[in-house]
């Protein structure tokens, strides 16, 4: 995403500092209108994209036009499933990490939690306790579990989603209010 190019650049730097061939990996920061020329280049054999449905449709069309392999991971709604034989403590720990990884601002962060009835009450009780104990703060402070969202508009959008969900019948188990500060 355009607001987090540093991750790709850091991956490229690390790979270039290693023993791997220097041309093995490239981070290319371009606008959507530049992607067709890149995908159509004879040296490009395939393309991957993790992103929105609209970005995937554009990249998929361009890859098909150039007859290139494409792998698209779009608009994920990643499920986290807890079955009756699960170790609840492990499930709670893993679930918390899966939801909060990179502040939840990654397409692979768990978003749907499916829990069988037989362990639901215990799982819900423990996961609520875990999230209540999660400390938001400065990401450089080791005592913080999560930092702020990447952009203010994302914070507003997330709060609107919560309000819409409540209006449609959802209940809030933890939080639900926008924290003070930036």
Name these PLM-found stretches.
Residues 3-6, 32-34, 53-55, 65:
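Short alpha-helical
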Residues 16-19, 38, 61, 104:
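A general structural signal for stabilizing positions within well-ordered secondary structure
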Residues 19, 42-43, 169:
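Conserved functional loop/turn residues at catalytic and ligand-binding sites
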Residues 1-23, 67, 89:
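Conserved small-residue-rich beta-alpha loop and adjacent elements
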């Amino acid at each position: 995403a355009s607001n987090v190019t540093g991750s790709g650049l850091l991956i490229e730097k690390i790979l270039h500092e290693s023993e791997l061939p220097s041309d093995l990996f490239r981070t290319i920061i371009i606008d959507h209108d530049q992607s067709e020329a890149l995908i159509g280049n004879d040296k490009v054999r395939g393309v991957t994209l993790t992103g929105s449905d609209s970005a995937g449709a554009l990249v998929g069309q361009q890859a098909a036009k150039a007859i290139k392999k494409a792998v698209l991971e779009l608009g994920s709604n990643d499920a986290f499933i807890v079955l009756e034989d699960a170790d609840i403590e492990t499930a709670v720990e893993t679930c918390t990490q899966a939801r909060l990884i990179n502040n939840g601002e990654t397409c692979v962060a768990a978003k749907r939690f499916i829990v069988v009835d037989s362990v639901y009450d215990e799982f819900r009780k423990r996961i609520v306790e875990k999230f209540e104990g999660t400390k938001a703060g400065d990401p450089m402070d080791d005592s913080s579990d999560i930092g702020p969202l990447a952009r203010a508009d994302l914070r507003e959008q997330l709060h609107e989603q919560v309000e819409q969900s409540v209006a449609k019948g959802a209940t809030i188990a933890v939080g639900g209010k926008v924290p003070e500060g930036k």
